[in-house]
Every structure is written in structure tokens, then in C-alpha cells.
């Protein structure tokens, strides 16, 4: 008589199953994550599956665990990553993401042939631009706008690789593409280029902060710009760090509604990750940790 036997889970799945049976924990896969994040899902390519152990710390919810960009990996667990210390975030900041490599943010976009084609045709982001950008340190910031047509403004600061001429040529090509799309170019300040609709509403632009540091912005011209010193304040002990104010984001309808209620009601959330370099994971495996504050 034949009988079906389920093959024991291995690797990350096995560890996550064991954690769920023994501790307070959460376990997710790529489908569940995409359902929760909606249109933001392409930016979570590093976190396609994983699990977190939950605990409390002086009124905070903290977690540690692991995530992987590839489903079904059989690698050993990555090194433990301690939860971040409290780092208050105040208005008008809504979100701050710092990373050591821009491809940590963009690899999900580049994996989609439709998005890749759109970015190449409309904004000139072809294979050579992707190749040069992927190793660049970056800071992404979302700030609430109290007035005007936008609920928030977005800034992306990147320390570009050498060859200023290459980037100047790309910005010139991008300018021609934006003009063909009906936008009007302005230069209100030195090294600052803004773009507006025919009705005069500024919708974005860029500014050189230093020889290799460029800030792109969507929305109005930022009231304050990041420093132009030799290095951005990027965390060196992790590969990326995210801070956000979920409650404030929800109030301006910028937080995905399917996120868990405890996240939506939180005053602040911190999440960070460190890639496991070398070994069998091929750079897809991460240690992750975080902190949530309800007050």
C-alpha cells in the first residue's frame, strides 16, 4: 500500500516552522508580502520570505530574524542582528531609508521587464546606468507637505560613481525626454533644475550637492537639502536601515491598508538588515531586526 509522506522542510522554512511552534513569531512568503505592500512590493525584493521572533523591551515591540530574496533556500541561519536603539523621528519626516548600495532598493524594479522598459524609454535608465548606480550609497526621504497639491515630497540622495560627464549627459537626455512629455524646465538656483506642469506646479527635479552627490526630488522643491560633505550619514554596521511613522503615513493615505493593525497604529517603526556575504546564499540572505513604538 502506497502512502504519501510530506518531505520535511529544510533551511529557512524549517527554522521558521520551528520558531512558530516554540515562540511568538511571524512567518511570511512573497505572495503574502505582495498582498500587504501592494504597489510598494517591488521595493521589498530582499524580503521575499522570512520569519521574525517577537518580544517586548520597555514598552516597545522588538524583533530579530532572517529574510531571503529567494524562496526555498537551504542555507544555514545568518548571524544574529541586535534590534536597533530607539531613534525618534519627528514631523515633517514620514520615512527615511538609508542603504549602502542602491541595488538593494532597485533590484525589484530591475527584475520586472515592464518596469525596466518603461524606465529606459521614459527616463533613459538603461543597462549602463543601472550598472553604475547599483553600488552607490543612498538616502531616501519622504517628508509631509502641509500646503500645496502634494501630500508629501520625496528625495533620493545618491553618491554617484566617478565620471561626472557621464551623468551630465544622462541628465541632458533625461531633460529632453521630460520636455517631450510636456514638462517645463526651470533653474531657480545654481545647480538646481526643477520641472513643472504648464500650470506652473513644480513636480520634481534634481540638484547637484557636490561633484558626485546628486539629489532627485518628486514634488515641490525641498525646503531643506541634505549636507554636501564627503559622505552621507549611512549606517556602517548594517546594509540598510528604515525608519517610518506609520500613523502619520496612514493619516495622509500613504500607508498600504493591508498592513497589520498594530503597524498602522504605531507611532514609529524601525527595520534594518545586514546581508550575509559569501557562502551558499549568494548575497540573497539577510539578518533582520527592528523595533515598533505605539507611543
Enumerate the predicted regions with their spans:
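Short, low-complexity intrinsically disordered segments
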Residues: 26, 31-34, 61, 78, ...
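Extracytoplasmic/luminal low-complexity segments enriched in Pro/Gly and acidic/polar residues
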Residues: 63, 69-180
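Single conserved position on a long alpha-helix in the C-terminal lobe of the eukaryotic protein kinase
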Residues: 1-17, 139-241
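Generic detector of solvent-exposed, compositionally biased contiguous segments
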Residues: 34-45, 114-130, 187-202, 257-265
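Generic secondary-structure transition motif, activating predominantly at the C-termini of alpha-helices
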Residues: 16, 20, 32, 41, ...
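Leucine-rich, highly hydrophobic segment in Treponema pallidum outer-membrane-associated proteins
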Residues: 6-109, 243-295
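Proline-rich intrinsically disordered, low-complexity coils
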Residues: 8, 39-42, 78, 83-84, ...
